[in-house]
Amino acid sequence: MGLQTAKWPSHGTFVLKFWLIMSLGLYSHVSKLLACPSVCRCDRNFVYCNERSLTSVPLGIPEGVTVLYLHNNQINNAGFPAELHNVQSVHTVYLYGNQLDEFPMNLPKNVRVLHLQENNIQTISRAALAQLLKLEELHLDDNSISTVGVEDGAFREAISLKLLFLSKNHLSSVPVGLPVDLQELRVDENRIAVISDMAFQNLTSLERLIVDGNLLTNKGIADGTFSHLTKLKEFSIVRNSLSHPPPDLPGTHLIRLYLQDNQINHIPLTAFANLRKLERLDISNNQLRMLTQGVFDHLSNLKQLTARNNPWFCDCSIKWVTEWLKYIPSSLNVRGFMCQGPEQVRGMAVRELNMNLLSCPTTTPGLPVFTPAPSTVSPTTQSPTVSVPSPSRGSVPPAPAPSKLPTIPDWDGRERATPPISERIQLSIHFVNDTSIQVSWLSLFTVMAYKLTWVKMGHSLVGGIVQERIVSGEKQHLSLVNLEPRSTYRICLVPLDAFNYRTVEDTICSEATTHASYLNNGSNTASSHEQTTSHTMGSPFLLAGLIGGAVIFVLVVLLSVFCWHMHKKGRYTSQKWKYNRGRRKDDYCEAGTKKDNSILEMTETSFQIVSLNNDQLLKGDFRLQPIYTPNGGINYTDCHIPNNMRYCNSSVPDLEHCHT
């Protein structure tokens, strides 16, 4: 018994401790639930006090809360109790859309993410940010912060700040004294016109800089301003007033550069020389008419280049861009190079530009500078094509009769043609009809192949308008078909050697205008072909007329059938209405007096039953019932005839009647 008595106290102590622990845990849980402010809603570690028209932060924010939602209220700077600063568990606070005019004090000391956008904050003090030593992300967008409203060195007090957003404020310059560990800075949509060389001096960790939508010019940016940003990966300076890209851009890590919507009209050759890791470049919506040759040579890692909406002038100075675009690697995506001038190539892609369409003076070593004079062909001055035998390698072919070349005496007294450079290729054009031209040529040197190009003039040129054909060197003529009547075409002939290229000096171009109606009286074939072409051109209109007439005929037939059907239906309805009306018990005889629904008193000695519908027989049977006359006689005639068309006469005298 003594041993058993000794064990009971130990067991009771264990049970007591167990119940005590359970009670404390339950109390702690209940106390947390009861600690939630009455005007808020608590869900685990989140407290929702947003959109409740609060003018101050509610008291009693429990410990353990990590995210505090206070946005879209009417909280002012006096609405932050001192006890809020001691809630250590809160790391994210949403205070956007309130009525703050200063950076608030007494925020939770360990807050890391703070949203203060869409307030009316005008001043930022060092004391306010000195309380937030762990702040990493600060959103101050869409406030009224000015440069003078930021105390010197205020942002430097937030020693842990990594992301600073100051978009849509009233800054006239970039604040000086930013935290050295800052990684992203947004000062877009402000009034910044000046960036001093000290603004980014210590920001060696900055990776993303956005200064879009400001008043920056090249004069307002100090020399070497961006050279300190050695880790910068993205730089956007869109919607400013730059005339050329900012100098001294850091090229160690820069990947994305956005320069669109400025006034850039010139890009220096060395502007992108150090940007060897650049992958994306946007120069759209500027005033660029040309580019310095080799400006993109150092961009070995470029993946995307956008150059839309620039007034590119496609003369000889842009020829290098055309060649560069043809040989860029497939990994590089280039968009936006479209010619805006001169008029003959407006709207044409620079990549597809044919230099033969332009008058480009070229210089050849040992030869004077010249410009081949294009022979403008008129339909009234063209001569028929001259057949010339193919030239052989050992002899100089004779010149065509219409244009004889100058000659000089040879060593044996014979004369040989020695044409100037501009006349080493003879080009002639013969009009077959209004949609076909035959081009003939004669070369005074050996040619492996020819490239003949033609394009319609006077219209905006897009891809596919310039047509070309490669022909062998033995061929000396080619027919161009499916041309438009009364249109001017520029035709160029380019001789190609074994490597498919020759100097531009041997290229010859000519312009020819097709006519609306050309009839060759001496050639029945051409005339017949022209008539066939005219018939072919008119056949679509004939087919369209036939189809239109057939459609109109079908519509008229359908309308006639519909009207006939409606007329027939209306007639049947009218007959049916008369038939129903004829079955009423008021319409039995020509004369009589209705007594009730079953007796009809006749006042005449005879009566006649007639059909009320002359088109079809009435349905049903009619029987004349016996009539008791005053003298006691019964006289009736059964008119039970299906068609009800016989007359029933009665010999009953006209006497006074009485009701029985």
Curated annotation (Swiss-Prot):
Cellular component GO terms held in the UniProt record: cell-cell junction; endoplasmic reticulum membrane; extracellular space; focal adhesion; glutamatergic synapse; neuron projection; plasma membrane; postsynaptic membrane
One GO biological process term: fibroblast growth factor receptor signaling pathway
PANTHER family to which the protein is assigned, alphabetical: AGAP008170-PA, LEUCINE-RICH REPEAT TRANSMEMBRANE PROTEIN FLRT2
SMART domains to which the protein is assigned, alphabetical: LRR_TYP, LRRCT, LRRNT
Keywords: Cell adhesion, Cell junction, Cell membrane, Developmental protein, Disulfide bond, Endoplasmic reticulum, Extracellular matrix, Glycoprotein, Leucine-rich repeat, Membrane, Microsome, Repeat, Secreted, Signal, Synapse, Synaptosome, Transmembrane, Transmembrane helix
Organism of derivation: Rattus norvegicus (Rat)
Name recorded for this polypeptide: Leucine-rich repeat transmembrane protein FLRT2
Signal peptide: 1-35
Compositionally biased intervals (Low complexity): 372-396
Glycosylated residue positions: N202
InterPro entries: Cys-rich_flank_reg_C, FN3_dom, FN3_sf, Ig-like_fold, Leu-rich_rpt, Leu-rich_rpt_typical-subtyp, LRR_dom_sf, LRRNT
Residue windows of the LRR repeats: 62-87, 88-108, 109-131, 132-157, 159-181, 183-202, 203-228, 229-251, 252-274, 275-298
Gene of this entry: Flrt2
SUPFAM superfamilies: Fibronectin type III, L domain-like
